[in-house]
Amino acid sequence: MKKKYIRRVLYLLIIVALFGLYFFPITNDNKSTNHIFNTTTSKNLSTKTKIDVKSEIEKYNNPDIIGYIYIPDVLSSPILKSTTNEYYLSHDNYGNYDKKGSITMDYRVNIGDKKILLYGHSGKEEDLPFLVLNNYTDESFFKKNNIIYVYDSNNTKYTYKIFSSYIETKDFDYVNIKTFNGLSWKEHLNKLKNKSLFKTDTELTDDSKVIILQTCSMVNKGNKKYQLVIGVLTNIE
């Protein structure tokens, strides 16, 4: 009788252990959808909207710094550009090798173009350049932090209002800068808008200019999944 009782206790303990192993990873994964990603990944996060890009170039002694991106309370960082998109994904703001990389602009475009694309890493480490973009899968975060400022080397400020945020898995037309699979420019932009997790009343036209921020998605982890945050130009000063 005693042996039978012990066997039952052991049996229950095994079930509890298996139950815990089964549900722990699910709970852990769900944390990634609760938007706990660090919103201060950039060192010395600025709280002002006036940036001196030339001083940033001097600070890092790197002429590849061509601008600055600032999202209040979210992101503050130089923008770098090389002859390839890959270089600054494995080099820091000084130009030294660093697997964390920097925020890099697509080599095909310039600040002020009809479409500018910025790339940066995200991952398990909290200080990766674009980890914070994964927070834009949360509607309240999306609505609260919807303005992007970009400064060029002359300190001209470009203001963008975010109108789309979504995770892309297979349609990578958004990186095209000249042709859009038969769509007009306006149709292309509305396609990006309609993919958004959250709806906005942003009106897009043939004259609209946009910025696209891309990083690897940390929500429901998987291969070839990119978090995109897209804004339309509203002001230049």
What are these regions (language model features)?
Residues 1-15:
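N-terminal Sec-pathway targeting helices
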Residues 12-24:
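N-terminal type II signal-anchor transmembrane helix
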Residues 21-237:
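Solvent-exposed, non-transmembrane regions of membrane-associated and secreted proteins
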